[in-house]
UniProtKB/Swiss-Prot annotation:
Family: Belongs to the UbiA prenyltransferase family.
Cofactor: Mg(2+)
Broadest EC class assigned to this enzyme: transferase
Annotated gene: ubiA
A GO-annotated cellular component: plasma membrane
The protein's name in its UniProt record: 4-hydroxybenzoate octaprenyltransferase
Length: 290
């Protein structure tokens, strides 16, 4: 009986950290890898690569915990989130706070193996991760904060590898913000009706009937900014082929969200994993010497 209770609690933590749903970690991982490859160039130090990959998974888990903690009063009123561990009572508020602290401490221990500038930048990463879930109460632009939080690994990666923050770093950072606002608006379109009822704000609500147009413009901005990164760093045809593939996926996303069907919008959101993957493959191939 005791083992059964322990097993149930571990499964609840597993769901709270979303380790059963890796999409969020992947959307955080791809821009991190882009930055490491451009900063290196093409050959990131193995330890730095390992630290950032592990940090992505730990901080994404921490972000999910604090997100559910912030939304614990709202999630019970939304069909998709009503059975999450906090509103269902499978995890207590104290347990969630303790888990968040443990995940952040583990992440910080990893960062301590890097240079001082990167350690200092990690403080901003924690602040952004903590701020994002609460922004939904005060602004219709929480997705911008999410983009900054998901993109902060980019300056950290550049700083860890080269101790510098060149123009390419910031172009990639702003590309990631545009990308995150686009894909998280698709995600928010799934819950838009419920969010309006309970008073949660999002870009999906702010953009209204212009949502598809603005998502499309953001996607164009992503490709333009990443294209400029490629030009500045002398990247070759493989990189631009990757961007072309990403552009084709953006067109497909526009097609399926045309009717604003909830399931279709969620599929469009999930498809962004392949956008990040294609850009990374093109980037990695561009640095290989054939």
């Amino acid at each position: 009986m005791e083992w059964s209770l322990t097993q149930n609690k571990l499964l609840a933590y597993h769901r709270l950290m979303r380790t059963d749903k890796p999409i969020g970690a992947l959307l955080l991982l791809w821009p991190t890898l882009w930055a490491l490859w451009v900063a290196s160039p093409g050959v990131p130090p193995l330890w730095i690569l390992a630290v950032f990959v592990a940090g992505v998974w730990l901080m994404r888990a921490a972000g999910c915990v604090v997100n559910d903690y912030a939304d614990r009063k709202f999630d019970g009123h939304v069909k998709r989130t009503a059975h999450r561990p906090l509103p269902s009572g499978d995890v207590t508020e104290k347990e969630a706070r303790n888990l968040f602290v443990i995940l952040v401490l583990l992440s910080f221990l990893l960062v301590l193996t890097l240079n001082v500038k990167t350690i200092l930048l990690s403080v901003a990463a924690l602040a952004l991760a903590w701020m994002y879930p609460f922004m939904k109460r005060y602004t219709h632009l929480p997705q911008v904060v999410l983009g900054a939080a998901f993109g902060w690994s980019i300056p950290m990666a550049f700083c860890a590898v080269s101790e510098s923050l060149p123009l390419s770093c910031w172009l990639m950072f702003f590309a990631n913000i545009c990308w995150a606002v686009a894909y998280d608006t698709e995600y928010a379109m799934v819950d838009r009706d419920d969010d309006v009822k309970i008073g949660v704000k999002s870009t999906a609500i702010l953009f209204g009937r212009h949502d598809k147009l603005i998502i499309g413009l953001l996607q164009i901005a992503v490709l333009a900014l990443l294209g400029t990164v490629g030009w500045l760093n002398g990247l070759g045809a493989f990189y631009y082929a990757g961007l072309a593939g990403a552009g084709a996926l953006f067109i497909w996303q526009q097609k399926i969200i045309a009717g604003r069907d909830r399931d279709a919008c969620f599929r469009a959101f999930l498809n962004n994993n392949y956008v990040g993957l294609l850009v990374f493959i093109g980037l990695a191939l561009s640095y290989l010497k054939f």
